[in-house]
Regions:
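Residue-level hotspots at or immediately adjacent to binding/recognition sites across diverse folds
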Residues: 1-108
């Protein structure tokens, strides 16, 4: 199952879902390809702060970051194993929320 989609512009978009699924489109969603990664956790939300920097959150405290327009994703430390369900990113700030009242803040 897929849980969330975010487009950086009219063409480039990403979708995330169960089993660590990350899909990418470069043609406005006409076709999608799987982004290779080694993260087995369910991924719930993807959000790009700008054209270059993207974030993904999910189960097991998963936080992934991309600084290359989503071509590669690197795991970030969250210091939690809680499920993270929601995400908001801007160029300067980020917020993630999850189970049991979890609130995480990022400041650039």
């Amino acid at each position: 199952a897929l849980f969330n989609v975010d487009f950086r512009d009219n063409s480039d978009g990403y979708a995330v879902g169960g089993g660590g699924t990350i899909l990418r489109t470069e043609n406005g969603g006409l076709t999608w390809e799987k982004v290779n990664n080694s993260y087995p956790e369910t991924l719930k939300r993807v959000d790009f702060a700008d054209d270059k920097n993207g974030w993904i959150v999910g189960y097991g405290g998963s936080i992934l970051r991309s600084g290359d327009k989503g071509r590669t994703w690197v795991r970030q430390s969250s210091n939690t194993s809680a499920r993270i369900y929601g995400l908001f990113m801007s160029k300067k700030y980020g917020w993630a929320v999850g189970e049991k009242g979890l609130v995480l803040k990022y400041e650039k």
